């Protein structure tokens, strides 16, 4: 795919000598290139541009890779500030550059030789801030597919189209789960009726499990005094990811980016005995984080989100039991939703890097050994990443691969030794001596937004009956003749607390059935002449083409209760 980057760079340089190049790379089988040029490209030009690029590939001659030192490369590319910035960020003093037709480019990962033929399919053009930073210049980004033959290109295009059909953004649009609107703002999702119902279904199940695993529900405001985040350290370290503060009655207030400081105050509001620990708090927290516009991705990466947040305040001797409890909670919930994690990462501290981590060897050794013993007892495979722990404690990440082959974190368990110190949290031991608790941050499913994105991609939108926003659709064969009976049945289903819709369109029966299939509604009830005469007999079918069933009313309700 990097041959596509080199081809595009070379063609741009030949046609627009003043072009400047930003980031490039390969993601999920596609290549992309950021660049600055006076010409603004549009999708309407793609067909001609593809022809030009395919023809130009045959003109790529004398492709040579050369190793040069960093100082020389910075001098060589000094006319291109974006390339020099990228080179400066490289730690190595030796770089590889690629020369084509006597023009040199920084495509350091390219593998030679190039194929004998080259074919390009362009997919998208967009505007992106350099390095995703809104304070930096905006560049154009072209995204495409490169192949060494027409047959390979055709195969890659088909695979790419299938991949995007399974993208949660496409599924969410087709099923009317969520939407975005520029009047609300980029990164601020709007939940449509079905999406709001799906959120509630997920929330109800998770909330019940939180209760069963000993968590207590609390609630805190979305706005807080800036001083709170200065105490927690979030403002110092993450202010660029937070929304700007606002002055209210001589106080600087800020939309919260996380809930842990609030839960610290809940723990602190009264004297705590060692007998009261652990304290487990949970909250559905609305959070705001100022993600760069270039990084926003459907529901996966947004600026406003609701986190099913959990915090455990415990003694150091309780760490193992609490992690085991949290681990089982995460497994219980995610198994119910059909998730098996592709990878579990255990991030540990590096004992040789004292500057990067809290300086308490005994605390690190104790907590990390307790975590590893949990993995061994549960016989769960995991990957150790030494040096990847947070400054304030070790972390467990539960990873899931999306339809676009991107690994995302769904659930987390994070130990925190720092926040209890910052907020001077204390409990009193058997001798009435003040001791500092440990905080364990637990993300069971993460945010509703990211979890639903992963759920839609995993199921392709085919949600099981118990999870479907609409479980049953009532379809009158003839709207004029059968509507009254269909409405009666619809009302009966509502009273049974079954999530039901009524198709009141004037479409023919075949189209109504197809609409239900497209909307992936698990059960369809057909109301015709026979059903109109006796509403105690139900004619139903599944959206996947199952045989039509005729059931008595009580048996149908029992079926929905059992499966839903």
From Swiss-Prot:
Documented EC number(s): 6.1.1.3
Catalytic reaction annotation: tRNA(Thr) + L-threonine + ATP = L-threonyl-tRNA(Thr) + AMP + diphosphate + H(+)
Positions of the UniProt region annotated as Catalytic: 167-464
Identification of the protein by name: Threonine--tRNA ligase
Similarity comment text for this entry: Belongs to the class-II aminoacyl-tRNA synthetase family.
Alphabetized CDD domains for the sequence: ThrRS_anticodon (cd00860), ThrRS_core (cd00771)
Assembly with partners or alone: Homodimer.
Highest taxon listed in the record's lineage: Bacteria
One GO cellular component term: cytoplasm
Pfam families for this protein: HGTP_anticodon (PF03129), tRNA-synt_2b (PF00587)
Binding site for Zn(2+): 260, 311, 441
Major location (coarse): cytoplasm
Note accompanying the cofactor annotation: Binds 1 zinc ion per subunit.
PANTHER family in alphabetical order: THREONINE--TRNA LIGASE 1, THREONINE-TRNA LIGASE
Single annotated GO MF: ATP binding
Compartments, as annotated in UniProt: Cytoplasm
Cofactor dependency: Zn(2+)
Keywords: Aminoacyl-tRNA synthetase, ATP-binding, Cytoplasm, Ligase, Metal-binding, Nucleotide-binding, Protein biosynthesis, RNA-binding, tRNA-binding, Zinc
Entry-linked InterPro entries: aa-tRNA-synt_IIb, aa-tRNA-synth_II, aa-tRNA-synth_II/BPL/LPL, Anticodon-bd, Anticodon-bd_dom_sf, Thr-tRNA-ligase_IIa, Thr/Ala-tRNA-synth_IIc_edit, ThrRS_anticodon
GO term, biological process aspect, one: threonyl-tRNA aminoacylation
Function noted in UniProt: Catalyzes the attachment of threonine to tRNA(Thr) in a two-step reaction: L-threonine is first activated by ATP to form Thr-AMP and then transferred to the acceptor end of tRNA(Thr). Also edits incorrectly charged L-seryl-tRNA(Thr).
């Amino acid at each position: 795919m990097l041959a596509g980057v080199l081809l595009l760079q070379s063609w741009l340089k030949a046609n627009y000598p003043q072009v400047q190049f930003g980031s490039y790379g390969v993601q999920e089988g596609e290549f992309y290139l950021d660049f600055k040029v006076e010409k603004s490209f549009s999708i309407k030009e793609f067909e001609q541009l593809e022809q030009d690029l395919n023809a130009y590939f045959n003109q790529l001659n004398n492709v040579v890779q050369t190793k040069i030192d960093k100082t020389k490369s910075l001098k060589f590319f000094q006319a291109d500030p974006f390339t020099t910035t990228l080179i400066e960020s490289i730690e190595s003093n030796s770089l590889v550059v690629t020369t084509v037709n006597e023009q040199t480019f920084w495509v350091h990962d390219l593998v030679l030789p190039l194929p004998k033929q080259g074919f390009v399919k362009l997919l998208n053009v967009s505007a992106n801030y350099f390095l995703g930073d809104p304070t930096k210049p905006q560049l154009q980004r072209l995204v495409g597919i490169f192949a060494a033959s027409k047959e390979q290109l055709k195969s890659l295009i088909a695979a790419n189209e299938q991949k995007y059909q399974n993208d949660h953004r496409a599924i969410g649009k087709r099923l009317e789960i969520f939407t975005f609107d520029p009047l609300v703002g980029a990164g601020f999702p709007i939940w449509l009726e079905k999406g709001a119902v799906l959120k509630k279904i997920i929330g109800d199940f998770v909330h019940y499990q939180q209760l069963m695993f000993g968590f207590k529900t609390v609630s805190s405001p979305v706005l807080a005094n800036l001083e709170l985040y200065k105490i927690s350290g979030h403002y110092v370290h993450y202010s660029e990811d937070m929304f700007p503060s606002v002055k209210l009655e001589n106080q600087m207030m800020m939309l919260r980016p996380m809930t842990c400081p609030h839960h610290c105050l809940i723990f602190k509001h009264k004297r705590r005995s060692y007998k009261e620990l652990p304290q487990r708090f949970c909250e559905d927290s609305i959070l705001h984080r100022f993600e760069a516009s270039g990084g926003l991705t459907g529901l996966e990466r947004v600026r406003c989100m609701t986190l099913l947040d959990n915090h455990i305040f415990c003694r150091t001797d309780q760490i193992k039991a609490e992690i085991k409890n949290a681990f089982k909670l995460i497994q219980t919930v995610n198994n119910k939703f059909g998730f098996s994690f592709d990878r579990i990462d255990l991030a540990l501290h590096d004992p040789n890097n004292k500057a990067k981590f809290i300086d308490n060897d005994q605390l690190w050794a104790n907590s990390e050994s307790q975590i590893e013993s949990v993995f061994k007892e549960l016989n769960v495979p995991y990957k150790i990443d030494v040096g990847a722990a947070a400054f304030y404690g070790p972390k467990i990440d539960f990873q899931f691969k999306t339809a676009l082959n991107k690994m995302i974190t769904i659930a987390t368990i994070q130990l925190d030794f720092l926040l209890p110190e910052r907020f001077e949290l204390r409990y009193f031991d058997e001798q009435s001596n003040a001791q500092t608790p440990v905080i364990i941050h637990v993300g069971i499913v993460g945010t509703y937004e990211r979890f639903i994105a992963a759920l839609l991609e995993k199921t392709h939108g085919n949600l099981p009956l118990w999870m479907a926003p609409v479980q049953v659709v009532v379809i009158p064969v003839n709207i004029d003749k059968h509507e009254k009976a269909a409405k009666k049945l619809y009302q009966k289903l509502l009273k049974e607390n079954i999530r039901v819709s009524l198709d009141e369109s004037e479409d023919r029966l075949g189209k109504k059935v197809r609409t239900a299939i497209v909307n992936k509604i698990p059960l369809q009830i057909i109301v015709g002449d026979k059903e109109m005469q006796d509403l105690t007999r139900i004619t139903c079918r599944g959206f996947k083409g199952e045989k039509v069933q005729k059931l008595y009313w009580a048996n149908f309700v029992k079926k929905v209760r059992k499966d839903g």
